[in-house]
Amino acid sequence: MLLRSRLGFIKAIQIGLAFLLVAPAYFVPVVAASSEVNVYSGRKEALIAPVLEAFTEETGIRVNLLTGKADQLRARLLSEGRNTPADVLLTSDVANLHRASASGLFQAIDSRLLMQRIPSRYRDPNGKWFGLSIRARVIAYAKDRVKRNDLSTYEDLADPRWRGRIVVRSSTNVYNQSLIASILVAHGDIAAGKWVKGLVENMARRPQGGDTDQIRAVASGEADVAIVNSYYYGRLLASGKDRDREVVASVGVLFPNQGDRGTHVNISGAGVTAHARHRSEAIKLLEFFSSPKGQRLFADINHEFPVNEEIAPSPIVAGWGSFKADALELATLGVYNGDAIRLADEFGWR
């Protein structure tokens, strides 16, 4: 099924569809056929298209976009091998970037602009992938049932006083795998396992749904506390629906671990594929994402924090106030992803 948006974009609803042109309706390519770049994106078209439109308008480089789930895109790239049309792989969470890199799907690139604009902890040390936006894993809480001062750290959520009061999505999701990995790096394998066990014992229900569902569960009284990515709360804040306004009116968010290592953060990021046929254009696209215009568009649309520290967050995101982020090199989380999955399985986080 194909839909044309008001901006002139064509949406690919299923991953099996062929590549579709993503360009402003008013833009008629007059450049050579090689002036294009093919993107596989794990983020939905609506969350990336405005950035691609601005890139095409500024550079004249046409963007061909295919969207799908991270695992599907990685499998597709592996299957296509040297014959892949993809020049860029864009996805959420450092765990997905690490898996792609470990599978040999990225090539190292040397870009002065990317090195200058993106802090080292948010990019691959070998130049194979680069963070493009930041999200925090925050604690959402019921304002009428939980005192803000009663919340402090991720570790505290394993305390028995939270028994039957916490909701969180499945550990099969990479967001939680990376959170477990951050606990493991901070405290070691044994302590991380005890934390997972305690958290599972405190769950109000079996893990289900996405992060927005966890926030709604807190608002409805099914739980008092949830662990979610910050941008899901941002989407509800930006919504014009009465139902969503009611949710955010009753639910607050807190950045944990401000007294020690800081809040766990993660990224959306991208890299140039190992067999990119339009390498130069691919690098230009990543550089555009890291530019002031690209950062404002991408971070604002997604209610995330810019990875370029010179760019201010959107008013909605800025409204949460400043916070201390964990300074851990995010590449480390990818290394410990397998251990995180093992701990989740061992201690029953389904």
Regions found by a protein language model. Name each.
Residues 33-98, 350:
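Early extracytoplasmic/lumenal segment of secretory-pathway proteins
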Residues 171, 175, 182, 187-256:
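Ligand-binding pocket segment of bilobal, Venus flytrap-like solute-binding proteins
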Residues 40-43, 107-115, 125-126, 129-130, 141-143, 149, 155, 242-264, ...:
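Short beta-strand->loop
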Residues 138-145, 265-278, 297:
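A bilobed periplasmic-binding-protein/Venus flytrap-type ligand-binding module shared by bacterial periplasmic
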Residues 84-89, 107-139, 155, 165-168:
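A structural signal for short loop-to-beta-strand junctions that line the ligand-binding cleft
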Residues 164-171, 288-311:
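Periplasmic-binding protein-like
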